[in-house]
């Protein structure tokens, strides 16, 4: 397993982009975008279809195709830790998304903090980086520029916590109950603008929403496999199995939780990032600010449908549009020449080559022969 994981890591690419300028001024805002479980081919395979954010990044930036993390195991926690802390996760003790704690005598989440309290909502779990005695990129910047701000946003708690370093000004993660929350390890109360955002999020309103295709049917048949594919998730569990578009939410499920499994969640987290830029006045003075954005819903969707599915193709088409709008917003509010934007993909727990359930029936038949 280790050799296979290392092989995947070596073949995976990190993509980093920056505004082209031979002598750029010192950036006022550095934005890091991390797409959870984004394989390199999800950029190249749909290259002809991209017209928004990915297109802008590939056309205007520097593209590094032969870089990788020299660590395993490749889960969300270790991957985001490597990005935010710039260190090998295993050496720091981040050996997975969860692990056995000898002192507590139980399995713990990698960002679990029994001494912290949730702020921002009644639901959710308090998370922090308190169990790791080291600093990260955000801390290094703030040690040189004390008035710089470090804000880290993610759907997953470990995404937001690890990207921001040891003590970001504001890490926010989704509580699967309709709110972005944090813990009192970082601050006592959430800023008013975050509370306002949570009130306006209204995740319940997505209950009757349908996920439909953005492009004509023949385009999906050209770039992805057939829509009906054995092993993909079908949310309508009370009906005949049919994992195809349009995709809704089963009436028995909580839309506030399942919002994380839809492309719309990535749109909401970019709206949250825009609110952070506006209300925290990021990139508006001589102190460079850092903004980390983790697209965690992509991991959920790739687990549900697989990277070759029409659903993932459509999810990336939608994300590319959302990113295009976000880049336009940053240009208007910070200035093209005053920010540095880079996109990074991380190896999550594993990358699907195909949906494993599609092999279940042939495997069962082979076993029954024995």
Predicted regions and their residues:
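His/Asp/Glu-rich, glycine-adjacent segments
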Residues: 96-287, 296-303
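Metal-dependent active-site segment of extracytoplasmic phospho-/sulfohydrolases and closely related
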Residues: 318-359
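Active-site-proximal N-terminal segment of extracellular/periplasmic enzymes that hydrolyze or transfer
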Residues: 21-62, 357
């Amino acid at each position: 397993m280790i050799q296979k994981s290392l092989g995947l890591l070596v073949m995976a690419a990190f993509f980093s982009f920056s505004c082209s300028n031979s002598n750029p001024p010192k950036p006022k805002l550095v934005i890091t975008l991390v797409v959870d479980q984004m394989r390199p081919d999800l950029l190249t395979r749909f290259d002809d279809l991209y017209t928004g954010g990915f297109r802008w990044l590939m056309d205007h930036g520097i593209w590094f195709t032969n870089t990788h993390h020299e660590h395993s195991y490749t889960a969300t926690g270790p991957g985001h830790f490597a990005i935010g802390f710039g260190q090998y996760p295993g050496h720091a003790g981040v050996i997975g998304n969860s692990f056995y704690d000898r002192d507590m005598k139980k399995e713990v989440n990698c960002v679990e903090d029994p001494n912290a309290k949730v702020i921002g909502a009644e639901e959710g779990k308090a998370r922090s980086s308190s169990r790791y005695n080291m600093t990260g990129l955000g801390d290094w910047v703030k040690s040189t520029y004390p008035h710089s701000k470090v804000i880290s946003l993610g759907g997953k708690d470990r995404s937001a916590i690890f990207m921001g370093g040891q003590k970001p000004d504001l890490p926010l993660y989704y509580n699967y109950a309709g709110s972005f929350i944090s813990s009192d390890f970082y601050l006592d109360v959430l800023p008013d603008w975050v509370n306002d955002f949570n009130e306006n999020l209204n995740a319940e309103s997505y209950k009757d929403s349908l996920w439909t295709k953005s492009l004509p049917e023949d385009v999906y048949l050209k770039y992805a496999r057939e829509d009906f594919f054995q092993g993909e998730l079908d949310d309508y569990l009370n009906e005949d199995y049919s994992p195809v578009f349009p995709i809704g939410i089963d009436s028995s499920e909580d839309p506030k939780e399942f919002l994380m499994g839809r492309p719309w969640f990535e749109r909401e987290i970019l709206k949250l990032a825009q609110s952070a830029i506006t209300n925290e006045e990021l990139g508006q003075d001589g102190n460079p600010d850092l903004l980390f954005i983790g697209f965690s819903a992509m991991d959920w969707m790739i687990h549900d449908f697989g990277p070759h599915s029409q659903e993932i193709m459509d999810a990336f088409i939608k994300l590319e549009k959302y990113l295009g709008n976000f880049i336009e917003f940053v240009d208007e509010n910070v200035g093209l020449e005053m920010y540095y934007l880079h996109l990074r993909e991380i190896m999550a727990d594993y990358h699907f080559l195909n949906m494993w359930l599609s092999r279940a029936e042939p495997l069962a038949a082979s076993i029954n022969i024995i």
